[in-house]
Amino acid sequence: MILLKVNHKPFMLPCVVIASLAYSEQVGWNRQLLPSSGEIKYL
């Protein structure tokens, strides 16, 4: 499970985008592709 914390409160990501981020992590893409306004933490 992945928690996406963003600095901007009124900010929601579609499930597709979250799934894409998880897929990119599995593939091994650079973390630079992730939104710079937030950070990803793993549970």
Curated annotation (Swiss-Prot):
Domain of life: Bacteria
Name of protein: Uncharacterized protein RP352
